[in-house]
Amino acid sequence: MPTPHNNAIKGDFAKTVLMPGDPLRAKFIAENFLTEPKLVKNVRGVQGYTGTYKGVPVSVMASGMGMPSIGIYSYELFTQYDVENIIRVGSAGAMRADLELGSVVAGQGACTNSNFADQYELGGSYAPICDFDLLMAAVESAKELGVKMPVGNLYSSDTFYDAAQRNMRYAKMGVMAVEMEAAALYCTAAYTGKRALAICSISDNLVNGTELSADERQTTFTNMMKIALEIAVKMDKK
């Protein structure tokens, strides 16, 4: 049934949903990567679409920015719309000098400065991790496509303008890149018994100050989307 944030009805969403942050990017993905996309959700400036890729139903819906936003949308998709897999497709800033611009990275885990997991009253810290089946499907798809995709830990920050010193402390612990959503998505998937994975394209490097041009960003975005869509095809067989 519809929620305060989603006016779709049960059955409108495929079992795999791709979630970029930007509503305009969700529209672009639907129109350029899916066959016969249909608008199924349009509330609060966030749209959701369902179409097919290689004959497999796939949905795409924006998450908005930050953990509270993706926490709401992913929880409703998992619990109200029978979605099984959510793949975050977004951008991230590299926190290591050796991580090349244009890389597509997969978040095996997501550390965070957020108190998002406090709602579960666990009495300690919780380590948000992705779903292993989704991660393996991503690794296999990247290899098949010939796309370099490092796998490791992401840093999901509650704040965009983080102090550089804090970022470097996370980098010293081997964290690959910073973004703003993965930890909440992984927590929500764990709590609801569903699957989630974040794959991100590296748009800039916080260590050396380099960044991709507009054309280069589009190329890495395409590689990320191809991987995500191939994951959906593989998961449809499970």
Describe the role of every protein-language-model region:
Residues A137-L145, T188, I227-M235:
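Generic non-transmembrane alpha-helical segments
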Residues V83-E84, M176, R195:
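Short acidic/polar active-site loop segments enriched in Thr and Asp
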Residues A183-E216:
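Zn-dependent metallopeptidase/amidohydrolase metal-coordination segment
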Residues P23, G93, Y155-T159, A184, ...:
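Glycine-rich beta-alpha junction loops
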Residues M1-P128, F132-M136:
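Metabolite-binding pocket within alpha/beta catalytic cores that recognizes anionic/polar moieties
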Residues L206-K238:
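His/Asp/Glu-rich mid-to-C-terminal helical/loop segments that flank catalytic regions of hydrolases
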Residues S125-M173:
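Active-site rim beta-loop-alpha module in soluble metabolic enzymes
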Residues T35-N42, G146-G152, M235-K238:
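Flexible, glycine/charged-enriched surface loops at secondary-structure junctions
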